[in-house]
Regions:
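Flexible, solvent-exposed loop/hinge segments and secondary-structure transition points
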Residues: 2-207
């Protein structure tokens, strides 16, 4: 056996060498993990800030206020009331002006013709709708998108604007009864209506 092979075997079996290698690998992993954690922390904060800016922008479209709180904790009563209307309650934000609560911005989801419609619904302290805003969606271009884009109805009122002022006192909102639909976009109109009913129910369950 050559001296080179003997030396290699000696190095491979040397406990000090193994310990040194183990420590080196451990420290390297720790440094890499630390760097990745730092980068992730910075990225996470930036993503959270951008998401919050978009959320506030959506809330500003549906209710007038100068202060928007973080999402409230959803209660069982709120989620149950929302589910009973056929939609899904995602988040509820309390809104204030001059330090006084002026209403809520409620993020809900409902089924549309091409998938889930996510929307923000503003509701004042009297329980009346102050506005409806649709989050980017997959509704059909030219038909469902007319509803999403708040296109005017025959009477000139925007299809989303028609919900403003409506409340639980009007009973369950329904297309053909107390809600109008754009011709050819009935499914999308029903989806938005379900979302508004869901938001109204959730608001009514806020303690």
């Amino acid at each position: 056996m050559s001296n080179e092979v003997k030396t290699k075997e000696k190095v491979d079996m040397d406990p000090k060498y193994i310990i040194k290698l183990t420590v080196t690998l451990f420290l390297t992993c720790m440094v890499v993990a630390g760097i990745l954690g730092w980068v992730n922390s910075i990225t996470k904060d930036k993503i959270a800030a951008i998401t919050w800016e978009k959320t506030v922008a959506a809330m500003q479209q549906v209710i007038t206020a100068d202060d928007f709180s973080d999402a409230m904790e959803l209660t069982d009563d709120m989620t149950a009331a929302a589910a009973a209307q056929g939609g899904t309650l995602d988040a509820v934000y309390e809104t204030r002006s001059g330090g006084q609560v002026v209403g809520y911005a409620i993020n809900v989801e409902a089924s549309g013709s091409q998938g889930i419609i996510s929307m923000m619904v503003g509701i004042d302290t009297d329980g009346a709708v102050t506005g409806v805003s649709i989050v980017p969606n997959a509704e059909t271009s030219g038909i469902g998108s007319k509803v999403m884009g708040n296109e005017p109805l025959a009477n000139g009122t925007g299809v989303l604007d028609q919900f403003i002022g409506k409340s639980a006192a009007d009973g369950t909102l329904a297309v053909g009864t107390n809600v109008d639909a754009i011709t050819g976009a009935t499914v999308s109109s029903k989806g938005v209506t379900t979302g508004v009913n869901t938001a109204l129910a959730a608001a009514g369950a806020i303690g």
